[in-house]
Amino acid sequence: MSKKVLIVTGDAVEALEIYYPYYRLLEEDFDVTIAAPKKKKLHTVVHDFADWDTFVEKPGYLIDAHASFAEIDPTQYDALIIPGGRAPEYIRLDENLPKIVRHFFEANKPVAAICHASLVLETLPDIMKGRSMTAYIACKPGVEAIGANYVSEPTHVDNNFVSAHAWPDLPAFMREFIKLLNK
């Protein structure tokens, strides 16, 4: 039986950070569910690193959320991915999401978080305290505020937890995550 992976996100998810993991997991024959605050078509955004001091944002593609957070029973899944973009800014406020994420850490299941996904993890300081991770550099203060150790690496693995800076790091991020899934 194929392993089941849950991706949690919402509108304004970074396009590459959802599409690359989604299709990479399907390619490996995993069963993948995308969940969001509401079951709907999600609007993605493209974050690019132009000649600015920060990233720029453009509209991206649409992608279906297969389920709402309220419909998710995390015990039915083997692993979790949290993409970045701006979605983490508001999905972390959904009362169901911290419970979902907590389950994966407490059950020691593989968890992957990229870029601004660390904003979701800020809702679980008791889980993150003492863990090491990386994230988009602008998220470093939030990572440190919850007691996690920010690591200046493009991709980092801390036991069952894989984290990465941003979409340019997706190949290593997914390689490490799939290694955890195949253990």
Residue ranges and their predicted role:
Residues 1-107, 119-132, 140-183:
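Extended, subdomain-level signal for the structured scaffold at the beginning of enzyme domains
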Residues 114-117:
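Short, thiol/selenol-centered motifs that function as redox-active sites or metal-ligating centers
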